[in-house]
Amino acid sequence: MGLMMTFTPTQKELFNKNIEALSNILLKESLKQIQSSKFELILGKDNLDINLKDTSDNTFLYENVIDELNTMLNTYNDKYLLYPVLYFYGFGNGILFKALLQNKNHQHIVVFEKDIEIIWIMFHILDFSHELQNSRLMILQTSSLDIEFFSNFCSSKPFFQFSRIYFLELMSHYYERFHEDILGLNKKLAENFKNSIVSHGNDPLDALQGIEQFVYNLPQMITHPSYKELLSKRKGISDTAIIVSTGPSLTKQLPLLKKYASKATIFCADSSYPILAKHGIKPDYVCMLERTEITAEFFNHDFGEFDNGICFIIKSIVHPNAINYLTKKTDNFTIVSTYASFIQYLKLDYFGYFNMGFSVAHMACYLSLHLNHKNIIFIGQDLAYAENGNSHPDDYQNSANYESQTYEHILTEAYGGKEKIKTHHVWLMFKRNLEQDVQKIQKYLDTKVYNCTEGGARIEGTIEKPFLWACENLLDKDLNKPFEKLEPLSLNKQNEFLLKAYYKVYQSIKHCRDFNDNFIKVYDKIKNSFMSLQNSQKNEIFIQEIIQDIDKTKTQIDELYNTQKDLIQILGPLLTQFELNLARIYVLNPKTKEDAFNKSILWIKEHLEFMELVYGHIKAQENALIKNILPLEEKLKERKLDKWMERVRR
């Protein structure tokens, strides 16, 4: 039972003022509900000597309030003076935050608190309204943070930009009792920051491969049925989608899948397509998303009649081999894009976009949503190793233990929640990504997501049911299969899009050249100024001028996001990685003139290296476009559109 606290009318007024300024609605409501507390307020002679005693075990929030405050302040004003974001576990008496926020370099202090009675008392004692108003002081109750919070927080400014210098500070020894909570929170933040970095693209070469393969695949995309055609003919014709992945648990579900195949729409991963063919289970859709050559091999089969009526849905950046294999066996495929700046620059919106996540099962999940399914059932979605160590079913094309030794094993919660199971970091990333979306689907849409894998890792937010239950309860009537055939555009329309694509790619080659011609001049100017620094008396003025030139150049690169979307896809990952690493230099706190000089030199050197990379990447894009525009040129010649091509080139 808590102690009844008596606050004066002035203190109650102060509490309300603080509550008013608090933007966290959940926390606001929780604080208003509190009537009593297990804490006793202990005030010393000094105004800053405010402590709390936990009457449940007679421990104190601080052992020595003033000493601990001064130690913290000295450390933070020395080591962390320039940090834009600081993280604390525990609100304490809050005085530290008021002191630190007098430093304008600290844009936000993020405080995580498990026991909000502490905040409740302190809100009666000190005025935090100014710090709370513009979210410079952010208070979060750890028990109320969900998947959506972590993914949004860790990908937003300025938290994401400074994620490489993130660390969590304990307010005082008192909080060590919550070590489980602290470790869990720290792990979630670190994982979500890592996830955000990956989703921003962490490899420019990856982006370049995407652009190359997209341009190479353009003629096939334009001359086959579009995503728009798919939606117009197939939306809403079935209530239940079964998504077939290639985890070790798939094998045991195949007999049931075969029995109920006529009553659900079956979406299968590229890797489970040969397995279903072997067992005579015809999927309605086969999805492919990855850009590698080995993935393309899942289509290197001649299954004859089996392929009739199957619709292949292919991400536009897959390896060209995948499409070559398909053209030999069927014309029933649709090439569709995800949102990416180079792809959107071409404005081939008719061929559609949808977000596809990181895994092929995730892509199938989105596709089934866009086709208005009310129930989505996952099978074979283990995202973990089987008990015997296998990563895939026995029938898997690349062997059942294909990924068994590739990555370090990590433990995660198993399906059913009773035990732990082995997985690896890539599967964990797929799992987290899927969990974020499943949570949103169940929250905002009238769609239920079931995990009927009956094995593997637990996917938070899905409804875990036996596959038999799902078949018996959700699948009652036969669907009219095969579904209506999809048609490509008329030849005239195709020609129009082929020419439009050719024009845009050709323009992009020109953009690369123009950008680099300009860029090299700026780079040379900065480099020459830098070289003459070493022997100049006017170093400080000179350094400021160089840094101003660098800032101008960075502004020009940032403007590409609005002016030349075709260049930003390859520069995006480069920029992200550069800014994340630069944060470490940004926060160095120079004590002497020499320190300041060295920091500036380091800053300029980093930017010169970055500029060399920018130049190199744009050059690589130019070369890639020149090489991969060839299939488009062939197609235009084949259709006797040479003179129009000439016009574009002129």
Language-model segment annotations:
Residues 82-86, 239-243, 287-289, 343-354, ...:
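Short, basic, glycine/proline-bearing loop/turn elements
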Residues 245, 269, 289, 313-315, ...:
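Generic beta-strand/beta-sheet core signal
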Residues 256, 264, 346, 350, ...:
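Long alpha-helical, hydrophobic tracts
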Residues 266-272, 286, 312, 361-364, ...:
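Extended, hydrophobic alpha-helical segments in both membrane/secreted and soluble proteins
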Residues 390-437:
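Phosphate-binding loop/pocket of nucleotide- and phosphate-handling active sites
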